[in-house]
Amino acid sequence: MRPTSGCSKDDTIQKQNRRHNTVDNKQEKLPLSIEIFLNKQINKISFDTIRSKQNCRLKEIYCRLKIRCRLKKKFIKSLSKKIISYHFISFHTIVVLLLLPPFSHLLVLVYPSVFTTAFYHQKWALRLNPCLPTYFFHRQRQCVTLLIRNANENMRARRVNSVMLTKPKQFLFLLEFITLFIFTYCL
């Protein structure tokens, strides 16, 4: 029995198809090095675009923060000056009242407490400078490092300001305390 012509035709068609497929696969496949290079380029482009967008957003946030910090600093400086000036007026009025004859014997007891409250008021006035809106920590996680950097800078600046403010006033308070103490005991 001879094999039918249909079977032989099918076999030849399948063989031809296989040959075509192998040729197509060989043409489509790129070398591994080129594929890796292209993938890297695609990833780099996408990463660069994302990073540039993030940088723009961070710059915007940073600018807004700077403006808000400046406004807050101005307001807080004026407020702290008012508190300190008000405190000095009240402090000196108390001292003048205590120098009057009926209250002079209470001066030694009251003066140290007034002295300590003066420092607490002053520290409170200095601590009123928050500089950083806390809700930014919740809103922008990318901005946390930037905010921490700003916070550290502000803390350094605040320490310098506090040292500059407290030292001369400490000296004045001590002088007043010594003079009044001597004055009361001499009398």
Swiss-Prot record:
The entry's keywords: Cytoplasm, Meiosis, Membrane, Nucleus, Transmembrane, Transmembrane helix
Main localisation: cytoplasm
One Gene Ontology cellular component: nuclear membrane
A Gene Ontology biological process term: meiotic cell cycle
Keyword Heme: no
Compartment(s) of residence: Cytoplasm; Nucleus membrane
Transmembrane feature ranges: 83-105, 163-183
Membrane topology summary: Multi-pass membrane protein
Region (Disordered): 1-24
Main function: Has a role in meiosis.
Name of the protein described by the UniProt record: Meiotically up-regulated gene 155 protein
Organism encoding this protein: Schizosaccharomyces pombe (strain 972 / ATCC 24843)
Gene this protein is translated from: mug155
